[in-house]
Amino acid sequence: SRPERLEKLNQLVHPRVAEDYQRWASGQQLAPYVIREAALMYEAGADKTVDRMIVVRAPEALRIQRVLQRDRNRTEDEVRNILNRQWPEEEKVKRADFLIDNDETQLVIPQVLLLHEKFCQRKQSSGS
């Protein structure tokens, strides 16, 4: 059935993506920090492999609208099914170390720059 096929696909893809990321990240020693982006960080247990978690949040209706604009071949039902397989945003927000609001009421870039400054300061103060 479909859920079983999706699970098999995830079992094949996620470990390889993680290996690829680790290979890439290990070559970034000169960077003040490294960011890993993935829609399923918590679901895949990848949150346990990073020092801090940033969650970008937006209302569900806006997320759906953005996916439909980006992926014109998807239906709203397909997008909702994808979102339903993810953790609820509220749970991700509770577990987050940092939040970025991407709800069109706040500018995103200033929020990102603020986090960049924090991460660079931590790097300098830790001396590593």
Task: Locate predicted features.
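Residue-level recognition of specific faces of alpha-helices
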Residues: 5-8, 37, 52-55, 66, ...
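Short, flexible helix/strand-to-coil boundary loops that buttress conserved ligand/catalytic motifs
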Residues: 10, 67, 112
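Small-molecule kinase domains that catalyze NTP-dependent phosphoryl transfer to phosphate-bearing small molecules
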Residues: 15-21, 29, 47-49, 70-120
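Conserved phosphate-donor/acceptor-positioning beta-strand/loop module used by diverse small-molecule
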Residues: 35, 47-70
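Short glycine-rich, flexible loops that bind phosphorylated cofactors or substrates
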Residues: 43-44, 62, 108
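A short, charged, Gly/Pro-tolerant segment at domain boundaries
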Residues: 121-128
